[in-house]
C-alpha cells in the first residue's frame, strides 16, 4: 500500500498577484521552490488562511529572489492579492518510507523571504502564533 504524505510546505506566504487570464498554475519564487524541494510542474494544494479556500494546481517558477507568489487562471476567483496561503506538496510512498520522511517546511515573512526551513509541520513560524496544544511536536 502507498500512503500519500505531506512532503513539503511553504507556510504563510503572501499572495503578490492574481491573474485570472493567465494559464492556470501558481507562480512561485524559484528560491522558495528550491528551499521546499518542490519541482516546477509539481502538484500542490493551496490553502488560503485568509478565507478558507482550498485548491489544487501545479507550480511554475517565478523570478529568483522576487518573493512572487502569483495565483493564475480560475484559481484567481478564490484567492486575492494579500491573502496568506500555505502551499503543500504531497508524495506517495510506502509505510516504511513515510515513517522515515522528514518534510521540508519553509517559513516566510510578509515579503515571502525565507525565515527558516525545518521538518516540523506544527512549529509556530512567527511570534504571535502558537503550536496547537493538541499537536505532538515532531
Curated annotation (Swiss-Prot):
Residues 117-138 are annotated as: Disordered. Pathway: Cofactor biosynthesis; (R)-pantothenate biosynthesis; beta-alanine from L-aspartate: step 1/1. Is synthesized initially as an inactive proenzyme, which is activated by self-cleavage at a specific serine bond to produce a beta-subunit with a hydroxyl group at its C-terminus and an alpha-subunit with a pyruvoyl group at its N-terminus. It catalyses: L-aspartate + H(+) = beta-alanine + CO2. Binds 1 pyruvoyl group covalently per subunit. Substrate binds at residues 57, 73-75. GO terms for biological process: alanine biosynthetic process; pantothenate biosynthetic process. The modification Pyruvic acid (Ser) is found at residue 25. Its EC number is 4.1.1.11. The active site is at 25 (schiff-base intermediate with substrate), 58 (proton donor). Its cofactor is pyruvate. One of its GO terms (cellular component) is cytosol. Keywords: Autocatalytic cleavage, Cytoplasm, Decarboxylase, Lyase, Pantothenate biosynthesis, Pyruvate, Schiff base, Zymogen. It is found in: Cytoplasm. It is an enzyme of class 4 (lyase). The keyword rRNA-binding does not apply. GO terms for molecular function: aspartate 1-decarboxylase activity. Catalyzes the pyruvoyl-dependent decarboxylation of aspartate to produce beta-alanine. Belongs to the PanD family. Heterooctamer of four alpha and four beta subunits. This is Aspartate 1-decarboxylase.
Amino acid at each position: 500500500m502507498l500512503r500519500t504524505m505531506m512532503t513539503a510546505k511553504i507556510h504563510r506566504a503572501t499572495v503578490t498577484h492574481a491573474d485570472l487570464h493567465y494559464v492556470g498554475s501558481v507562480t512561485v519564487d524559484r528560491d522558495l521552490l528550491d528551499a521546499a524541494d518542490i519541482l516546477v510542474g509539481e502538484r500542490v494544494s493551496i490553502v488560503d488562511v485568509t478565507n478558507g479556500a482550498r485548491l489544487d494546481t501545479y507550480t511554475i517558477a517565478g523570478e529568483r529572489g522576487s518573493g512572487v507568489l502569483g495565483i493564475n487562471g480560475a484559481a484567481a476567483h478564490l484567492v486575492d492579492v494579500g491573502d496568506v496561503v500555505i502551499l503543500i506538496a504531497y508524495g506517495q510512498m510506502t509505510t516504511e518510507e513515510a515513517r522515515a520522511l522528514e518534510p521540508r517546511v519553509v517559513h516566510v515573512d510578509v515579503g515571502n523571504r525565507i525565515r527558516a526551513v525545518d521538518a516540523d509541520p506544527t512549529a509556530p513560524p512567527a511570534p504571535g502564533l502558537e503550536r496547537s496544544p493538541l499537536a505532538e511536536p515532531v
